[in-house]
Amino acid sequence: MAEKFNLQDRFLNHLRVNKIEVKVYLVNGFQTKGFIRSFDSYTVLLESGNQQSLIYKHAISTIIPSSYVMLMPRKQEPEKEDETPEDQGS
């Protein structure tokens, strides 16, 4: 059986491990920023300075990282084969 790809967990873990600062927008319009220290199925622990906030995921509207996050390499174009090995050296 193929391994399931969980985008949310990979995204949050990448932000946590690489210590990327994020802006978190809540559904009520409140905005906060900091570093993700931990997360589980229901919550995200955000740290800003010496303050920690435990935010419920259902209250989060958007998470914006301060730098680009690439979770998977972009698809590479297939190499063009202009010459076959037989054509070379003739």
Swiss-Prot record:
GO molecular function, one term: RNA binding
Pfam family, one: Hfq
Official protein name in the record: RNA-binding protein Hfq
Assembly and interaction partners: Homohexamer.
GO biological process entries: regulation of DNA-templated transcription; regulation of RNA stability; regulation of translation, ncRNA-mediated
Gene source species: Thermotoga sp. (strain RQ2)
Record gene name: hfq
InterPro entries: Hfq (IPR005001), LSM_dom_sf (IPR010920), Sm (IPR047575)
Positions of disulphide bridges: none
Family: Belongs to the Hfq family.
SUPFAM superfamilies given in the database record: Sm-like ribonucleoproteins
Stated role: RNA chaperone that binds small regulatory RNA (sRNAs) and mRNAs to facilitate mRNA translational regulation in response to envelope stress, environmental stress and changes in metabolite concentrations. Also binds with high specificity to tRNAs.
GO annotation, cellular component aspect: cytosol
Domain spans labelled Sm: 9-69
Keyword DNA repair applies: no
Cleavable signal peptide: none
Alphabetically ordered keywords of this record: RNA-binding, Stress response
